[in-house]
């Protein structure tokens, strides 16, 4: 920040972006360039009086020159545009004129930088040969999710304050250290807030840009869109058997299970196999040297967590235990195994990792900015919310490493868990589902195919689930509140996550928390029904 001292613009930006402040006292010539992708320079001067000097000082100009020679610089000015004539604008990557040094100007500028607010203004004066009167570009916000007044989408703004209250009460009651909550309607965000902190030590506030371990939301955010595409292309049918999809399932008790059965959780596949327990010492749950080392090597190359590496064949041994697992009687049995099995089918067919398939087919087309497997490849720890202090397997604080034990043995990339994301990116994927495969001019799959996946096929057998999606319980009592439509769909995650979309009201709800920190034994989120109560409040806020 140059010019007048001010924290407001930085605080507004920090809610949207994972940013750090460069102090004026820094030696800019010795800046660690690898640490920053770009630098935002704001210049603020009082606009209360025309007699107040609002020009850039010589020191300001030198700082801008130094920074722009090292890294991409976004210059945001809250002052008279005539002052820009003294700056070498050729080195500036982006220039945003906000004019007014007030709260509205700072708020609008912060949203414009992250693509949530339109930019339509033109220069009212000429400031250089290159930037003349009338210059300027028009940038529209992402075609999805502009931020709007709740009333514009038929929502009572005052009623939403009850969600704020419930969130704060939940944090005070140690339901979770913090949370992100988003609600959208008609493709527009009317509620998007962060509450609390990363941990109960309150050292770092939750930002909207922070990412959470979303646990089983991975099933519908990563694996399911790819499977729907495969179905849409005729590569997978509902009556396709596991044995026909991959030879690894032949001559096993899972050979004849159909895609429809396993993805509707009707096949009798058991909920999970705690394979990791076999790799620990019984007396103290410490990793056995037979399977783990604290240093990476050719033989121990599966990164389980910080400073813990699994043996090269550990994932194979685990997968064999999943294939060899017993079957229960057919009926609704929610399980992690179906999406793990389908991950194998996809990876074997395309000779690509699920991570690569997700990036190629989902993340890049949707322009997701904050959704990753193995997030430490993309983010600093400060922007990742920890999930647990693990004293039963990895013996470490889990931050940036998947919480789920089965996914952990798989190196963090799995069909059932492993994805990290924030509320905004999740809402994008849910909006794509809500629009039945269409998003911003792209068609991910046909609407007819989506309808087939959002249908309950085993309702008469007492199974509420669709193909991959969770659905409301017919008589209530589930994650959703009783008044939600049967057409609605979504999923929940073990770490304290939840997302739901309703085609009838066109409302999307995203709730992220780390209720498992510091211990997954904390069940207050479920016991106090926080997510369901918040969803009910959203529906009670509907005006029309």
Regions flagged by a language model, labelled:
Residues 1-154:
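C-terminal non-catalytic regions of proteins with extracellular/luminal or membrane-system context
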Residues 173-182, 202-262, 325-338, 414-417:
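Short active-site loop at a secondary-structure junction
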Residues 23-24, 124-133, 435, 439, ...:
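Short, gly/Ser/Thr-rich active-site loops of penicillin-recognizing serine hydrolases
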Residues 254-486:
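Short, surface-exposed loop or secondary-structure junction motifs
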Residues 154-214, 235-237, 404, 520-521, ...:
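Short, conserved catalytic-motif segment at the N-terminal edge
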Residues 488, 495-508:
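Short, surface-exposed beta-strand/loop micro-motifs that present aromatic residues
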Residues 45-48, 79-84, 101-103, 220, ...:
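Solvent-exposed loop/turn segments at secondary-structure junctions
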């Amino acid at each position: 920040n140059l010019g007048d001292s001010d924290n407001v613009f930085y605080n507004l930006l920090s809610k949207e972006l994972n940013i750090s402040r460069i102090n004026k006292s820094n030696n800019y010539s010795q800046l660690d360039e690898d640490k920053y992708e770009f630098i935002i320079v704001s210049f603020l001067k009082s606009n209360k009086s025309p007699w107040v000097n609002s020009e850039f000082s010589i020191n300001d100009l030198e700082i801008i020159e130094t920074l722009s020679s090292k890294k991409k610089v976004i210059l945001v000015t809250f002052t008279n545009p005539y002052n820009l004539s003294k700056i070498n604008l050729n080195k500036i990557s982006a220039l945003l004129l906000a004019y007014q040094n007030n709260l509205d100007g700072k708020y609008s500028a912060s949203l414009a930088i992250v693509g949530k607010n339109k930019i339509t203004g033109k220069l009212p004066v000429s400031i250089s040969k290159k930037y003349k009167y009338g210059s300027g570009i028009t940038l529209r916000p992402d075609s999805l999710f502009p931020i709007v007044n709740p009333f514009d989408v038929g929502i009572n703004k005052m009623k939403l304050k009850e969600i704020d209250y419930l969130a704060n009460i939940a944090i005070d009651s140690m339901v979770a250290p913090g949370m992100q909550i988003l609600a959208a309607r008609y493709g527009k965000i009317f509620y998007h807030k962060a509450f609390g902190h990363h941990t109960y030590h309150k050292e770092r506030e939750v930002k909207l840009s922070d990412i959470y371990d979303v646990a089983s939301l991975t099933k519908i955010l990563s694996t399911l869109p790819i499977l729907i595409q495969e179905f849409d292309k005729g590569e997978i049918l509902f009556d396709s058997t596991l044995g026909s999809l991959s030879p690894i399932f032949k001559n096993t008790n899972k050979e004849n299970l159909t895609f429809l059965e396993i993805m509707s959780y009707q096949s009798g596949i058991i909920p999970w196999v705690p394979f990791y327990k076999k790799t620990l010492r019984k007396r103290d749950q410490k990793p056995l040297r037979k399977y783990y080392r604290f240093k990476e090597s050719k033989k121990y190359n599966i990164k389980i967590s910080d400073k813990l590496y699994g043996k090269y064949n550990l994932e194979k041994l685990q997968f064999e235990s999943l294939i060899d697992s017993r079957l229960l009687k057919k009926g609704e049995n929610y399980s992690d195994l179906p999406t793990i099995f389908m991950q194998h089918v996809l990876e074997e067919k395309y000779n690509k990792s699920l991570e690569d398939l997700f990036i190629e087919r989902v993340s890049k087309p949707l322009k997701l900015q904050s959704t990753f497997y193995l997030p430490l490849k993309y983010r600093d720890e400060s922007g990742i919310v920890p999930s647990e202090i693990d004293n039963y397997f990895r013996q470490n604080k889990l931050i940036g490493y998947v919480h789920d034990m089965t996914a952990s043995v798989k190196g963090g990339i799995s069909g059932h868990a492993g994805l990290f994301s924030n509320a905004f990116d999740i809402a994008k994927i849910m909006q794509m589902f809500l629009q039945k495969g269409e998003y911003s001019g792209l068609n991910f799959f046909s609407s007819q195919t989506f309808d087939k996946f959002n249908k309950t096929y085993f309702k008469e057998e007492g199974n509420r689930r669709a193909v991959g999606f969770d659905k409301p319980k017919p008589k209530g009592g589930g994650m959703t509140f009783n008044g939600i439509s049967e057409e609605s769909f979504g999923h929940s995650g073990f770490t304290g996550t939840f997302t739901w979309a309703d085609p009838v009201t066109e409302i999307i709800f995203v709730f992220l928390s780390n209720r498992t920190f510091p211990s997954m034994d904390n069940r207050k989120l479920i016991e106090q029904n926080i997510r369901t109560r918040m969803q009910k409040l959203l529906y009670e806020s509907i005006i029309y």
